[in-house]
C-alpha cells in the first residue's frame, strides 16, 4: 500500500511539472501559416524577444516572406521574415503587433540523458499540443545543406517526446520551463530531434536579428575525426584530430598547402577534436583573417597560413 502511495506521489509530481511547463509555454508558442509563391505551409514558432520577434525553423519558413501567427488565446498577428539561416535550420520573424512575453531560454549544454523535456507545438494543425519525454541522447549530428554549402548542426538533442509534422519550430523545454531546443525533425517513431540552444545557436540568432543572415568563413576542407596515437595524444593533450579527406581545388586550404591525409590539430591554437569544433571557429570574424593551422604530416609538425573566404551557397 505504501509503495502504491509513493508511486502515486511520483506520478503526481511528474504531472505537476509537465502541466506547469505547459501552462507557461503554451501562450508563448504560436501556430504559423507561411505564405509563399509555392503555396502555404505551417509550423510553430516561439516568442523570442519582448518586441515581437519569433524563432522558428528555416525549413518552416521555406521561401516565404510573410506569415500569420496565431496564439493560444486566439489573437493573431502578421509577421515578416527577418532572417533565415538554412545551415542551422533557424529563422527569425517579427510580428506587427504586441505579442506575449518570451519564455526563458536555457542552455542545452547543461542537459543530461534522462532529463525530462516537454515539447510544445502545433502538430497536424492542433494548436497548443503538449508532449513529454526524456532526453534520449545528446551530441547527435544533423547534416543540412543550402545550395552547394553544407554544414553539420552540432549537439542536436534526441528525445522520445512525440513530435509530428507541425511541431517544427516549436519549443523543447526542460522541467523548469526553459527553452533548451527548437524542435526540428521527426527521425522515426518515438525519435525526435531539436536544434539546441547553446552558445553557437545564440550567435546565429544574434546575427539573424541584427543582420538578417549569418556570414561564415570557408576553408575548403573535407575532414573526418581521427584518433591520435597515444604518444601524440599525450604530447598535445587531445585524443582526436581532424584527418583531411579532401582539399577543394583553389580553396584557401589548397592555397595554404594542406593535403589529403594531413591530421589537423588546431586552428589559431584552438584544438580541433571534431567537425563542430572547426565550424565554431568559422564565423564572420574569420573571413579574410590570417589563420594559422597546425597539422601533422608524415609524423612531422606542420604550420600553414590560410586566409578563409566567405562561404556562399552557390
List where the protein language model places each region:
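Short, structured beta-strand/loop micro-motifs enriched in basic residues and often containing a Trp
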Residues: 98-102, 242-248, 272-275
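PDZ/PDZ-like domain micro-motif
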Residues: 168-171, 227-235, 248-266, 281
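PDZ-domain C-terminal substructure recognizer with occasional recognition of PDZ-binding tails
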Residues: 206-213, 243, 255-259, 265-271, ...
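A structural signal for short, hydrophobic beta-strand segments that form beta-sheets
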Residues: 81, 135, 244-247, 264
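Residues at or immediately preceding the N-termini of alpha-helices
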Residues: 108, 198, 250-252, 275
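Serine-dependent protease modules
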Residues: 2-233, 238-240, 283, 299, ...
Amino acid at each position: 500500500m505504501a509503495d502504491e502511495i509513493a508511486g502515486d506521489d511520483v506520478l503526481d509530481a511528474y504531472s505537476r511539472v509537465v502541466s506547469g511547463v505547459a501552462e507557461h509555454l503554451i501562450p508563448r508558442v504560436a501556430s504559423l501559416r507561411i505564405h509563399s509563391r509555392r503555396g502555404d505551409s505551417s509550423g510553430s514558432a516561439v516568442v523570442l524577444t519582448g518586441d515581437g520577434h519569433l524563432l522558428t525553423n528555416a525549413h518552416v519558413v521555406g521561401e516565404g516572406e510573410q506569415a500569420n501567427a496565431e496564439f493560444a488565446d486566439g489573437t493573431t498577428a502578421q509577421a515578416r521574415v527577418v532572417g533565415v539561416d538554412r545551415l542551422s535550420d533557424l529563422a527569425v520573424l517579427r510580428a506587427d503587433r504586441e505579442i506575449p512575453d518570451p519564455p526563458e531560454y536555457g542552455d542545452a549544454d547543461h542537459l543530461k540523458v534522462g532529463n525530462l523535456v516537454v515539447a510544445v507545438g502545433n502538430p497536424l494543425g492542433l494548436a497548443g499540443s503538449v508532449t513529454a519525454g526524456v532526453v534520449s541522447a545528446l551530441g547527435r549530428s544533423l547534416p543540412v545543406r543550402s545550395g552547394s554549402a553544407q554544414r553539420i548542426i552540432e549537439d542536436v538533442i534526441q528525445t522520445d517526446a512525440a513530435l509530428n509534422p507541425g511541431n517544427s519550430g516549436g519549443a523543447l523545454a526542460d522541467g523548469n520551463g526553459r527553452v533548451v531546443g527548437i524542435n526540428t525533425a521527426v527521425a522515426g517513431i518515438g525519435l525526435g530531434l531539436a536544434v539546441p540552444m547553446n552558445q553557437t545557436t545564440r550567435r546565429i540568432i544574434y546575427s539573424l536579428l541584427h543582420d538578417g543572415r549569418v556570414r561564415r568563413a570557408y576553408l575548403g576542407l573535407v575532414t573526418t575525426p581521427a584518433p591520435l596515437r597515444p604518444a601524440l595524444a599525450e604530447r598535445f593533450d587531445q585524443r582526436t584530430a581532424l584527418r583531411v579527406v579532401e582539399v577543394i581545388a583553389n580553396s584557401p586550404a589548397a592555397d595554404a598547402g594542406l593535403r589529403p591525409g594531413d591530421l589537423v590539430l588546431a586552428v589559431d591554437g584552438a584544438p580541433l577534436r571534431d567537425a563542430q569544433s572547426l565550424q565554431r571557429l568559422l564565423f564572420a570574424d574569420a573571413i579574410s583573417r590570417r589563420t594559422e593551422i597546425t597539422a601533422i604530416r608524415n609524423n612531422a609538425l606542420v604550420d600553414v597560413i590560410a586566409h578563409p573566404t566567405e562561404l556562399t551557397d552557390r
